[in-house]
Amino acid sequence: MLKEFREFAMKGNVVDLAVGVIIGAAFGAIVTSMVGDLIMPVIGAVTGGLDFSNYFTPLSKAVTANSLAEAKKQGAVLAWGSFLTITLNFLIVAGVLFGVIRAMNRLKRNDEAVAASPPKPTREQELLTEIRDILKSGIRPQV
């Protein structure tokens, strides 16, 4: 049973998946930082210094806080600013992954096209083809 598990774990697809998950987790942290530290501050500056992560709509009159963390402690809120930031994260990740997969598919198609084209016949093969064609035609060459 241990041998079977080792064979399964060492298959290319499982190892590739593990590497992809690890790289994806690291990439997610980069995208989160890019959105939170670079993109949202620029959007905030353009919109007059707004911090979208703290934007919320209280669902009860008991919520009087000015920050999202405090408002969540006081009652139910719609944290639409946080949702906007997370949605932007998702769109960036999806766009980058789409680009990577598209590039990989293009490379794969190119590799398949190169592999599918037959190799040029060697000089020996060309001579054998000529001899075959002469024999098929029934004409005897003059020697």
From Swiss-Prot:
It is found in: Cell inner membrane. One of its GO terms (molecular function) is mechanosensitive monoatomic ion channel activity. GO terms for cellular component: plasma membrane. It is a multi-pass membrane protein. Keywords: Cell inner membrane, Cell membrane, Ion channel, Ion transport, Membrane, Transmembrane, Transmembrane helix, Transport. The keyword Transport applies. InterPro entries: Mechanosensitive_channel_CS, MS_channel, MSC/AndL, MscL_channel. The chain crosses the membrane at residues 19-39, 81-101. Homopentamer. NCBIfam families: mscL, PRK00567.1-4, PRK13952.1. Belongs to the MscL family. Channel that opens in response to stretch forces in the membrane lipid bilayer. May participate in the regulation of osmotic pressure changes within the cell. This is Large-conductance mechanosensitive channel. The gene is mscL.
